Regions:
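Protein maturation boundaries and topogenic segments
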Residues: 1-179, 257-288
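Short coil-to-beta-strand transition motifs
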Residues: 87, 198-209, 241-246
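Short beta-strand-centered aromatic/proline hotspots
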Residues: 92, 206-214
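Extracellular/periplasmic catalytic domains that process cell-envelope and extracellular macromolecules
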Residues: 100-102, 187-189, 201-203, 215-217
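Hydrophobic beta-strand signal
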Residues: 107-109, 194-197, 251
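Short coil-to-beta transition motif at edge beta-strands of beta-rich domains
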Residues: 120, 181-199
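PDZ peptide-recognition modules
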Residues: 122-125, 198, 211-213
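Extended, hydrophilic extramembrane loops/domains of integral membrane proteins
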Residues: 211-269
Length: 288
């Protein structure tokens, strides 16, 4: 009897010791119990219990999916109001900004004024440039590996297309933007803010760096370029953008990045349909 009593007392002592050890954690859990009301699925569970369908897997799945969709929609719109941007979240769809950002990264965007945009300013108060090719008022200059000095980037592009110049993308780089009528040159750097605009020619949002901002007679505009070493030319010298991007066509500038979480969407909704499409369509796909 004494032995049994001793064992019982030891067991009770161990249980008290264990309870005392975990008590702070339980207290913290109780302290932050109110956070459950921030979880939208708490309300989904309450709804299912109220209608008596929580054990019905089909109805439960439908309610949970609807809850997830509505929660994402509300969060998206809330971020839009918070960041003053109609498109607060955008997925990087190509590698044109590597190593700054990678395909599948999600960028959070905010609205801003021209003064707040970090990029060299060019004043052209007497010139209207909306809808004009940039060759009407400026041109970019490129360096080519093995060639001394700089030459107009569009001249380099023509030589590459004709076969007169055999180089890889890494061997060519846009270095300057020249505004001959103003006697002004701007070095192309990676110090400007990253902005997002919709490319009419490509049908996708472009996430590139602002390399110059222009205050013209007919409004504000931005010149852009990707950071990647494989992205040799500014957007306005390629098929991404016909002219300088009007300020009101910008969706926002990036304020922070969430890595990789957009990759699932790209694989399921972009890559897979492209992979299964015709050869003509497949050639336009943005594969990694």
């Amino acid at each position: 009897m004494k032995e049994k009593k001793r064992l019982r007392l030891e067991r009770e002592a161990r249980e008290r010791e264990k309870a005392e050890k975990w008590e702070p954690i339980f207290n913290v859990k109780e302290k932050f119990a109110f956070l459950r009301w921030l979880d939208p699925f708490t309300y989904a569970d309450m709804f299912l219990e109220k209608i008596g369908k929580k054990e019905n897997s089909a109805i439960s799945w439908a309610v949970y999916l609807a809850t997830a969709f509505l929660s994402a929609l509300l969060l998206y719109n809330a971020l839009g109001l918070l960041f003053h941007s109609p498109s607060p979240m955008v997925i990087v769809v190509s590698g044109s900004m590597e190593p700054s950002f990678y395909r599948g990264d999600v960028m959070a965007l905010s609205g801003w004024s021209l003064e707040e945009l970090n990029a060299p300013l060019v004043e052209m108060p007497g010139t209207e440039i909306d809808g004009l090719d940039i060759s009407e008022y400026s041109y970019s200059e490129c360096s080519v590996k093995g060639v001394e000095g700089l030459e107009p980037c569009r001249s380099v592009i023509k030589k590459i297309q004709s076969g007169a110049l055999q180089v890889s993308a890494k061997d060519v780089l846009a270095e300057k933007i020249v505004f001959p009528k103003l006697g002004k040159e701007i070095d192309i750097t990676k110090k400007g803010d990253v902005v997002v605009y919709f490319s009419e020619t490509q049908g996708i949002p472009i996430i590139h760096r602002a390399i110059a901002k222009i205050r013209a007679k007919d409004g504000f505009f931005v010149l852009t370029k990707g950071d990647s070493v494989l992205n040799s030319f500014i957007d306005q010298d390629t098929a991404l953008s016909y002219g300088a991007v009007p300020f009101n066509k910008l969706q926002g500038k990036t304020v922070f990045m969430i890595p990789w979480i957009g990759y699932v969407k790209l694989i399921l909704l972009d890559d897979l349909p492209c992979f299964l499409s015709s050869p003509v369509t497949k050639a336009k796909c943005q594969f990694p």
